[in-house]
Amino acid sequence: MKCPFCQHDDTQVLDTRISEEGDSIRRRRRCVSCDKRFTTYERIELAMPVIVKKNGSRTDFDPKKLQASLQLALRKRPVSAEAVDAAIHRIEQKLLSSGEREVVSGQIGELVMRELQRLDKIAYIRFASVYKSFEDVAEFQDAIAEVGRERKPPSK
């Protein structure tokens, strides 16, 4: 690795440690030319899939958009910021673990709906009404009935 002080190409690793989280490696290095020491970090770089929109255009995944969508649906609902962050993390993990380079936007919408269904039924209905483009009251009633069926314990 190139020395940041003298730009010499040869450095020596003095110490290597894994971070507490286990997701990075810290290396203490010494330049063989100028004898100065410096620290480097190695981390895994994971690329989120590209999002393919309904019109066919492609855009980079933006976690801020995901957060804004969840927060809008959850506006004035009793759900903590930590729960929202955890939901975003689960969605990101599902996208990463899919191994796909591209994901259609509809898949993200479905993941958001699943998370909202777990977090808050009212927020789920809010999001579903926009995401599924509800046209009339009957579609709201169907969605509410579906949520209600999921809450009832099975009869014996």
Swiss-Prot record:
One GO biological process term: negative regulation of DNA-templated transcription
Domain (ATP-cone) spans: 49-139
Zinc finger map (unnamed): 3-34
| Note on cofactor | Binds 1 zinc ion.
Keyword annotations: ATP-binding, DNA-binding, Metal-binding, Nucleotide-binding, Repressor, Transcription, Transcription regulation, Zinc, Zinc-finger
User: GO: which molecular function terms?
Assistant: ATP binding; DNA binding; zinc ion binding
Instruction: Tell me if DNA damage is a UniProt keyword of this record.
Output: no
Cofactor names: Zn(2+)
> Which superkingdom heads the taxonomic lineage of this protein's source?
Bacteria
Protein family per UniProt: Belongs to the NrdR family.
Q: Which NCBIfam families match?
A: transcriptional regulator NrdR
What does it do?
Negatively regulates transcription of bacterial ribonucleotide reductase nrd genes and operons by binding to NrdR-boxes.
Q: What is this protein called?
A: Transcriptional repressor NrdR
Organism of this sequence: Herminiimonas arsenicoxydans
